[in-house]
Amino acid sequence: MQMKYLIPIFFLVLIVADHCHAFLGMIPGLIGGLISAFKGRRKRDITSQIEQYRNLQKREAELEDILANLPVY
């Protein structure tokens, strides 16, 4: 084979090997995520989300009050 054909093939094999290596490294994390999803460990608690939203609204209102009381230069 000529060199102009070997170099692209080499880079193609290098890229494919890199992607396969990255995929193999992700498999344990994916399996763990699936197991925890099926067991229901990561269920979201809606009450905590509501409290976070209320706290965010309260902080936004306080910030608006502070900015309204600042003198304009």
Swiss-Prot record:
Record keywords, A-Z: Antibiotic, Antimicrobial, Cleavage on pair of basic residues, Fungicide, Secreted, Signal
Cysteine disulfide links: none
Residues making up the signal peptide according to the UniProt record: 1-22
Record keyword Signal present: yes
Expression (tissue specificity): Expressed by the venom gland.
Keyword Membrane attached: no
GO biological process, one term: killing of cells of another organism
Cellular component aspect of the GO annotation: extracellular region
Propeptide: 45-73
Compartments in which it is found: Secreted
Main function: Antimicrobial peptide. Has a high antibacterial activity against the Gram-positive bacterium S.aureus (MIC=5-17.30 uM), the methicillin-resistant S.aureus (MRSA) (MIC=17.30 uM), and E.faecalis (MIC=69.23 uM). Has antifungal activity against Candida spp. and one Cryptococcus neoformans strains with MICs values ranging from 6.25 to 100 uM. Also shows an inhibitory activity on C.albicans biofilms at high concentrations. Has a moderate hemolytic potency (18% at 20 uM). Also inhibits the growth of the five cancer cell lines tested.
Family per similarity comment: Belongs to the non-disulfide-bridged peptide (NDBP) superfamily. Short antimicrobial peptide (group 4) family.
Other comment: The primary structure of the mature peptide is identical to that of NDBP4.23 from Tityus serrulatus (AC S6D3A7). Negative results: does not show antifungal activity against Candida glabrata (ATCC90030) (MIC>400 uM).
Protein name in the entry: Putative antimicrobial peptide clone 4
Organism, as annotated: Tityus costatus (Brazilian scorpion)
